[in-house]
Amino acid sequence: MPKVGMQPIRRQQLIQATLTAVDQVGMGDASIALIARLAGVSNGIISHYFQDKNGLIAATMRHLMNALIQNVRERRQALTEDSPRAHLQVIIEGNFDASQVSGPAMKTWLAFWATSMHHPSLHRLQRINDHRLYSNLCCQFRRTLPLEQARNAARGLAALIDGLWLRGALSGDAFDTEQAQRIAYEYMDFQLAKSAS
């Protein structure tokens, strides 16, 4: 009989083991057996909590997405001003937070993006994540720009964030988050300046 209260601990343990496995060997070779071994549990525990590897991958991605949401939320709560610029900055900072740019997180995101094209449940998660970023950006740009300009600015900044993140992930060097943020801020300021003209 399972111990009371172990489910959240086991789930988190398996998610961390998944991040480690993907970091070490990639998504394709991150087998149930390897993940279970890294977590120090039997293979059957993964089936018990997640049904299969795709269920575990989905849970791992929800974990990373929730960390992103929480990072942005905490930064918003710490804001001392309510300007669109301030809100856009915290969205940018959250996307380049250490929780999103660590080696295991970056490799898991990359593998997830590739895998999501072939698995409907993972594709759904990817669409939710994309839509959340776009709608949050658009909401802030809309405070100062006409609707179509706000939509285009949001699309552009979302693409820039993803592109900077992707280049950083694939570079093989340490991710220069300050440089990535600076580039994103320049684009943001360029778009916000359109409201003054």
Curated annotation (Swiss-Prot):
One of its GO terms (molecular function) is DNA-binding transcription factor activity. Keywords: DNA-binding, Repressor, Transcription, Transcription regulation. Residues 31-50 bind DNA. GO terms for biological process: glycine betaine biosynthetic process from choline; negative regulation of DNA-templated transcription. Residues 8-68 form the HTH tetR-type domain. Pathway: Amine and polyamine biosynthesis; betaine biosynthesis via choline pathway [regulation]. PROSITE patterns: HTH_TETR_1, HTH_TETR_2. It holds the Pfam family TetR_C_6. It comes from the Bacteria. NCBIfam families: betaine_BetI, PRK00767.1. Repressor involved in the biosynthesis of the osmoprotectant glycine betaine. It represses transcription of the choline transporter BetT and the genes of BetAB involved in the synthesis of glycine betaine. This is HTH-type transcriptional regulator BetI. The gene is betI.
